[in-house]
Amino acid sequence: MTTNHLTDPALSPQDHEDWQCFVTLLQQAFAENLQHPILQLLLTPDERTALATRVRIIKELMSGKMSQRELKNELGVGIATITRGSNSLKFASNDVKAWLEQQLLK
């Protein structure tokens, strides 16, 4: 698989360092079965809902069963939200897409 921690050009060096700290903290939380309380502490209910919606968007786009417009209507989100998910998928590596397929399209 490709490197898991590529530098994100959209982030400043400090933001990248902070992001890596967050990812490391989450990895440790999952290792110690503390993921739910840590995510509830760090994310607002709206942020948790937005992340869950983003996963659903990625899943539905990968399955190809609905058009972007149908997905927008089903989820009650803006077309720009669907487009961001679609654009993210376009730039994901083949390894990441294959992993997502295994996880989301079982």
Swiss-Prot record:
Record GO biological process: negative regulation of DNA-templated transcription
Gene Ontology molecular functions: DNA-binding transcription factor activity; sequence-specific DNA binding
DNA-binding region ranges: 68-91
Gene name of this polypeptide: trpR
Function: This protein is an aporepressor. When complexed with L-tryptophan it binds the operator region of the trp operon (5'-ACTAGT-'3') and prevents the initiation of transcription. The complex also regulates trp repressor biosynthesis by binding to its regulatory region.
Family designation: Belongs to the TrpR family.
Naturally occurring in which organism (per UniProt): Photorhabdus laumondii subsp. laumondii (strain DSM 15139 / CIP 105565 / TT01)
Subunit organization: Homodimer.
Alphabetical keyword list: Cytoplasm, DNA-binding, Repressor, Transcription, Transcription regulation
Subcellular location: Cytoplasm
GO annotation, cellular component aspect: cytoplasm
NCBIfam families: TrpR (TIGR01321)
Record-given protein name: Trp operon repressor
Gene3D superfamilies: TrpR-like
